[in-house]
Regions:
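Glycan-recognition and catalytic cores of secretory/periplasmic carbohydrate-active enzymes
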Residues: 1-191
């Protein structure tokens, strides 16, 4: 509706949706949801995967709860025809497995580490740099309006003032490593 001036986002039995309302009207207009992937990915699947991916940056579980609700709501549809719902399948995989996360604690990421990450195939991995110390992290938290560090950064300081990598997969994390290749080899060792 071109005259819509307010929007609301919520979860219904049909899943995550955005509704627009004309000023003073009170009537809600629901935008149709695209469940299947066609020439473009399903917006519902992309949104659910993105929320699951970004959940580690929140101190509550709100993003994850919405992503879980979306994939649970559409579980039968996903199982019945996974090739038509690839984006929802990807979202389901991210919700269930947590994916791969690489947190780098360093005041400046070494160029060699950037090259390694650029050359290494880490499908769907989330790389999350952060300052080397909690004191350095505090201005970031203040800018984001957070009282405490989110899980992806919490307790992940640099070791001995050296850039440090924390590699996680499936909600399990490697020990902190000051050698990025060694940290990433932890992924291969898990297979």
């Amino acid at each position: 509706d071109p005259d819509a001036t307010e929007s609301e986002t919520g979860t219904s039995e049909a899943g995550q949706s955005t509704q627009r309302r004309a000023a003073g009207d009170g009537a809600l207009f629901a935008r149709p949801q695209e469940f299947t992937d066609r020439s473009t990915p399903s917006s519902l699947g992309v949104a659910a995967e993105t929320l699951a991916l970004l959940d580690g940056f929140r101190t509550d579980r709100r993003f994850r709860e919405v992503a879980e609700a979306v994939v649970a709501t559409h579980a039968d549809r996903i199982r019945a025809s996974p090739l038509e719902h690839v984006s929802l399948v990807r979202a389901t995989e991210r919700v269930e497995s947590g994916g791969v996360e690489v947190t780098i604690a360093a005041d400046e990421v070494p160029e060699a580490w950037r090259e390694t990450l650029g050359k290494r195939y880490l499908p769907g991995a989330l790389v999350a740099p952060r300052p080397a110390t909690d004191d350095g992290l505090q201005p970031w938290l203040d800018a984001l309006g957070l009282d405490e560090a989110p899980p992806i950064w919490s307790g992940r300081d640099a070791l001995s003032d050296e850039p440090t990598a924390y590699v996680c997969e499936g909600f399990t994390c490697s020990p902190p490593r000051t050698d990025l290749d060694e940290a990433l080899s932890w992924l291969a060792d898990r297979e």
